[in-house]
Swiss-Prot record:
Top-level taxon in the UniProt lineage: Archaea
Naturally occurring in which organism (per UniProt): Archaeoglobus fulgidus (strain ATCC 49558 / DSM 4304 / JCM 9628 / NBRC 100126 / VC-16)
Name of the protein in its database record: Uncharacterized protein AF_1078
Length: 45
């Protein structure tokens, strides 16, 4: 179980890191970006 949790955590960190350019563009508020990140991540297989 621990391995699965760590794997999800790593995937989540890698996914969130891929969104950094979007944040730098400053088009969305930080809260909106967080919501979008969570929604996108939950939809990943």
């Amino acid at each position: 179980m621990r391995i699965k949790i760590e794997d999800r955590k790593t995937k989540r960190l890698n996914f969130l890191n891929s969104w950094k350019p979007l944040r730098l563009e400053g088009r969305l508020a930080a809260e909106d970006i967080e919501k979008l990140r969570l929604l996108k991540y939950e939809n990943l297989p």
